[in-house]
Structures are given as structure tokens and as C-alpha cells.
Amino acid sequence: MNYRFTNILKVIIFFCFIFEIQSEEIQKPYKNLEKALLNPADVRNLDLSFLGLKTLTNKIGQLKNLQKLDLGGNEPTILSKEIWQLKDLQKLNLNNNKLTVLPKEIGQLQNLQELSLHSNELVNLPKEIGQFKNLQKLNLDNNKLTVLPKEIGQLQNLQELSLLSNKLISLPTEIEQLKSLKNLDLNHNELTTVSKEVMLLETLENLDLRSNKLKTIPKEIRQLKSLKVLMLTGNQLTSLPKEIEQLQNLKTLNLGENRFQIFPVEILELKNLLELNLYYNQLVEFPKEVGQLKSLKYLSLYHNQITTLPVEVTQLPDLQELHLSGNKITILPKEILQLKNLEWLSLSNNKLNALPKEIGQLKKLQRLELGNNQLTTLPKEIEQLKNLQRLELDSNPISPKEKERIRKLLPKCEIDFEGGGGE
């Protein structure tokens, strides 16, 4: 009985394998239009990317069942009108072309779910873009857009809107109507304020506002209850609104390259925060209350003006990476070495002249950056770091004899005495 059952099982597995291979063959994209036209009714996926095409034959309109079309990396300054007759099209890629205008006929693609237009030369969008009732992803990165049409608000099923590297100075009020939006990327634009309408996007999980000209964040940010990632790097912020502490689902907060002189204490209420970046600011103190962020795994404060570390940092039991390079730290408190889960510790470009022997307690440490300090020796306990893969000690006054001693203490570790790789 077991033998027969085993044979039957083998037969079932065999046919499943054959079926999977056939399915993969059906989904495999055609790379040649002429070959695709031999069996036009069977073609679902056509990839004509990076072929140097400047025109497109009107025969493409024969592919009535086409669902995915990739025309990226060509130079069709005028798109074939037959494309707009492909009513079953779900995914359209027009990246890396030289398009300056998007024809209004594009609105005829009622079944479109993904539209990618990044790296073109578009200065505006036709109002017909609002006709994409099924559109879920819209990528407009690297264009020359200064405004968005108000019809953008009609994209009720849109989940991802990417507008990186454009010239937007504001957003239409209708953007608040995007009730399904989860990801909004406005990185590298010309925004001086965040419109309150953005703060009404209750489903938003990822908001990227890096490299704009923001000086303040509106208190209405408290309404983004679903927000998990907030990127504010490269702006002109000096403070945060108290209301930000209501974002209890926030996992990642990036505030690097701003103008903070005082640690924004509002952050301390974000109990579920996993990653906090405050690099390249003007902070002089590291608040002892940071120990309240019990879930924190990644903390980056490199290139500030911090002189001392509070012992309360040991209250971050899950911390895996601590980046403090480019500060003015003179002493590393032995308590900090109780961070049992620490894997990466960066202390380059400080004023350390010694390490506590407790360094050996960091059993999970894989990378230790100590370049450009005033160290002349390391404690013997460094040999206890069995998982250490890289140690950076460049630009320290360490003698050749001491270097040889350190190498013997860590025979399996890559040790850099010359420089090349720290923050």
C-alpha cells in the first residue's frame, strides 16, 4: 500500500512540475515584436526595452491580449497611438525615454495597474491620468514636473506614488482623496511646506520627504496613524511638533542632515521605533532619556558635537548598531559595553585615548570602527570578540609592536591600520 501511494505521489509531483514549467513558458516575455506577431493572440508579455527604438510599428495593436509592455530605454518621442488600443494592458513601462509629453489617449488604458514613467522629461501630466481607476503603482521619478493635475485625486486604488527628483513646489489639495495610498515618495523636490492634505492620508505607511526645503512639520502629522517610515533627511528642521509622538506605529525615523541643536524629546514617546537617524546635525548632548526607546535596534548620531554618552544607553537591550563617529567623545563608559546584542559600533573621529577592558563583553560585535582617535593600545580583552570581522584603527598613534600584538589577539579579524572605510 505504501509503495503504491509513493508511486502515485511521484506521478502527481511530476505533473505539477511539468505544469509549472509550462506556466513559466507562457509568462516568459517576448523580446522580438516580429516573433510576437506570429501568434498575436497568445502574447501576454512583450519586452522591447533598450533596443534603441525611435518609432514603434502600428502592428503592435494586433496584440489584443497583451497585459505587460516594457518599452523602457528607447527614444520614441511620439508614442504609437495603437498602444492605447491595448485594452487588457495591466503594466506599462516607459522609463528612460525622452518623452516630453504624455498623450491624453493614455487614459483609455482602463485596466492599467502599474505605470512607470521615470527618467523622462515630462513637465506636466494630462488630466486623463485620473481615468486609471485600477492603477495601483505610479512612478514619475526623475522628470521635470512642477505641478500635478488635480485629477490625480481620482486614482482611488493607487497604493504607490513616486515623485522623486522633480521640481514640485506644492501638491494639489485633491491628493487627500487617495484613500488607498501607502507609499508616497517626494524625495528631492522643492517643497517648503508639507500640505495638510497629505496629513489626511490615513492609510499612508511610508512618507519620504528627503532633500526638500522644509523648516517645519505640521502638527496634523498626528493623523498619519498607519505611518511606519518617515524620511526627513536633508531639510532645514530645528524641531519637531509634539504631535509626532502620536505616531505609535512608526518604525523608522530619519532626521539626518538637518539643523537640530537639541535632541527632539518628542521622539522618546515613539515606543515602537526600531531605527533612528540624527546624523549630521549640531547636537551637543545625548539625552539620558534615550533609554526609553526599548525597541530601538539602530541608532545613528555620527557627525554631531556630542562629548559624553549617558550610561542609560545600556537600557536599549535590542540595539544592534550604534554609530557615533565624528563627535567629540573622550571616554567610552564601561556601562555601554553591556549592550549584549550590539553588532556594529562606530566611534571613528572622536578623542578616545583608551578603551575599557569591558569591551570584551560585546560577544556579538562584528564591526568596530576606532579610526582617527588617540589610541596607543587596546586591552587584552579584545581577544574575546570571537565574532569580530573588521576592526578599523587607522590614524591612531599605535606603534608597530602594538599592531603586531593586536593582530595576534585577533588572528581571524580583518584589521585596518591604514584607513579606508569608516564614517
Question: What would you call each of these model-derived segments?
Answer:
Residues E34, L56-K59, L79-E82, L102-K104, ...:
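The feature encodes a structural signal of leucine-rich repeats
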Residues K91, V101, Q110-E114, N134-K137, ...:
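Periodic short-repeat tracts
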Residues M1-Q67, S395-E423:
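N-terminal capping/linker segments that flank leucine-rich repeat
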Residues Y3-F5, F14-F19, F132, F260-F263, ...:
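Aromatic (phenylalanine/tyrosine) cluster motif
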Residues R44-L48, L69-L71, L89-L94, Q113-L117, ...:
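Conserved hydrophobic beta-strand positions in leucine-rich repeat
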Residues Q338, E343-K401:
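Ankyrin-repeat and related helical/solenoid repeat scaffolds used for protein-protein interactions
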Residues P40, Q62-L66, W84-L89, G107-N111, ...:
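Leucine-rich repeat
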